[in-house]
Amino acid sequence: MLSVILKSSIRGLGKAGEVAKVRPGYARYLLADGKAMRATKRNMELLAEKLAVMEEESNQKLREAEKVAEALAGECFVMIRQASDDGKLFGSVAVRDVAKLLGSLGYNVQPKEVFFSEVIKRIGEYEINVELHADLVAVVKLYVVRNEAEAERTRLQVARDRKSRNAAAASEVQDAPVEDGGDEVVSVDSVAAEDGGADASGGTA
């Protein structure tokens, strides 16, 4: 068996950058096809350096994604769609529609990064998942309404609810009990009284 470094992911063998052990014939095929390189000491060192750079880049992208997720959490996403009196949409909301809505608000999100668990065919509130990074999926609320008047009422209600939650959270922090350090507080008078008693005892002696 020969050890090779995979230059691309191969099903059943490993991911790009991983070391795989294969038969000599298969190793020659992978090397000739440019899908792998020999696992020499120098190549292993180069791989380690490349992986370190890739990890740092991934961490940087994750930090940026966390900022985007925080911004998304502060938004109110409202989509206006035509619907019947009973709330059934004339059509449905697709992932591309959600991506377009987010894009109109300045978020660079592709349709393939948006997914939800149910088909949106009615007026209402829905949870939308946005994959910002391989390790981070933001969950946002989407409100589907009939017209601009409903949209404005929804925005105001969401703003009031958030204000109430923030106020409640701030109140809980203020009302949180302060832990007692356990230090005993002794008054000056009691210390003086003890000193006086000690002097009196000494005088008797």
Curated annotation (Swiss-Prot):
<dbReference type="GO" id="GO:0006412">
    <property type="term" value="P:translation"/>
</dbReference>
<dbReference type="InterPro" id="IPR020594">
    <property type="entry name" value="Ribosomal_bL9_bac/chp"/>
</dbReference>
<dbReference type="GO" id="GO:0003735">
    <property type="term" value="F:structural constituent of ribosome"/>
</dbReference>
<feature type="compositionally biased region" description="Low complexity">
    <location>
        <begin position="184"/>
        <end position="195"/>
    </location>
</feature>
<comment type="similarity">
    <text>Belongs to the bacterial ribosomal protein bL9 family.</text>
</comment>
<dbReference type="GO" id="GO:0019843">
    <property type="term" value="F:rRNA binding"/>
</dbReference>
<keyword id="KW-0694">RNA-binding</keyword>
<feature type="region of interest" description="Disordered">
    <location>
        <begin position="160"/>
        <end position="205"/>
    </location>
</feature>
<dbReference type="InterPro" id="IPR036791">
    <property type="entry name" value="Ribosomal_bL9_C_sf"/>
</dbReference>
<dbReference type="InterPro" id="IPR009027">
    <property type="entry name" value="Ribosomal_bL9/RNase_H1_N"/>
</dbReference>
<dbReference type="GO" id="GO:0005840">
    <property type="term" value="C:ribosome"/>
</dbReference>
<keyword id="KW-0687">Ribonucleoprotein</keyword>
<dbReference type="InterPro" id="IPR036935">
    <property type="entry name" value="Ribosomal_bL9_N_sf"/>
</dbReference>
<dbReference type="GO" id="GO:1990904">
    <property type="term" value="C:ribonucleoprotein complex"/>
</dbReference>
<dbReference type="InterPro" id="IPR000244">
    <property type="entry name" value="Ribosomal_bL9"/>
</dbReference>
<dbReference type="InterPro" id="IPR020069">
    <property type="entry name" value="Ribosomal_bL9_C"/>
</dbReference>
<dbReference type="InterPro" id="IPR020070">
    <property type="entry name" value="Ribosomal_bL9_N"/>
</dbReference>
<keyword id="KW-0689">Ribosomal protein</keyword>
<protein>
    <recommendedName>
        <fullName>Large ribosomal subunit protein bL9</fullName>
    </recommendedName>
</protein>
<dbReference type="Pfam" id="PF03948">
    <property type="entry name" value="Ribosomal_L9_C"/>
</dbReference>
<comment type="function">
    <text>Binds to the 23S rRNA.</text>
</comment>
<keyword id="KW-0699">rRNA-binding</keyword>
<dbReference type="Pfam" id="PF01281">
    <property type="entry name" value="Ribosomal_L9_N"/>
</dbReference>
